[in-house]
Regions:
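Histidine- and/or cysteine-centered catalytic micro-motif in compact active-site loops
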Residues: 3, 48, 95-97, 139
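Well-ordered beta-strand positions
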Residues: 132-134
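Bacterial N-terminal signal peptides
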Residues: 8-17
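C-terminal/domain-edge helix-coil "capping" segments
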Residues: 23-44, 50-55, 87, 120-129, ...
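N-terminal segment of the mature soluble domain
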Residues: 54-118
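Positively charged n-region of N-terminal signal peptides that target proteins for export
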Residues: 1-7
Length: 194
């Protein structure tokens, strides 16, 4: 009987350690400890920076029924869907809305400019439409990683940075990015309640 209990105990410890080893690792860093996240009533979503993983591109080329390659627009849709599911307390503003507003007020269509020029004009004008903006960056190498950098729209200073690194079993797909977004909005809500 003692051996059986010992075996079950060791098995439970092994299963727990394996699940912990493959779990996603997340971290939030507050760059401005004095900034009150409760001041964010409108959060603008800048076009996510995303490049498909080499494995996803290879699968798409070789397999006829491979999943469709993810695009930044698909990620933006996931962001809004997750925010609605999580019932965030602030208004989200899409990059398309901001681009249209900038075009209407300045006459400049930033979607036709280089990334550097577009971001510069975006930063100069975003204060007219939102309290803060977030730039999502997705990296796909040996692990799937998502970064979310939140900036104050008034003076473009860095408020906080969120990073989540997927486990070894995570894949370059919308389900994982949706899970990452849920965690981001959840931790942003927790930070705003402090």
């Amino acid at each position: 009987m003692k051996k059986l209990i010992t075996i079950f105990s060791l098995l439970a410890i092994m299963l727990f350690s394996i699940s912990t080893a493959f779990a996603a690792n997340e971290k939030i860093t507050m760059m401005d400890e004095d900034y009150n996240l409760k001041n964010i009533h409108t959060l603008a979503i800048y076009t996510p920076s995303y490049k498909p993983s080499a494995l996803s591109i290879e699968r798409k080329a070789k397999l006829p029924n491979a999943p469709e390659l993810i695009t930044p627009d698909m990620l933006t849709d996931v962001i809004f869907k997750v925010a609605k599911e999580d019932e965030v307390t602030y208004t989200l503003l899409s990059d398309k809305d901001v681009i249209q507003n900038i075009k209407a007020t300045t006459g400049t269509d930033i979607s036709t400019l280089s990334n550097r020029e577009a971001l510069s004009i975006y930063k100069n004008n975003i204060k007219n439409y939102a309290d803060a903006y977030v730039i999502f960056t997705f990296a796909n190498d040996s692990r799937v990683v998502m970064f979310a950098d939140v900036y104050d729209a008034k003076d473009n200073h860095w408020i906080c940075s969120y990073q989540i690194i997927g486990g070894d079993t995570e894949d370059d797909n919308l389900e994982n990015y949706s899970m990452f977004m849920h965690k981001f909005f959840r931790i942003l809500t927790i930070q705003s309640q402090k």
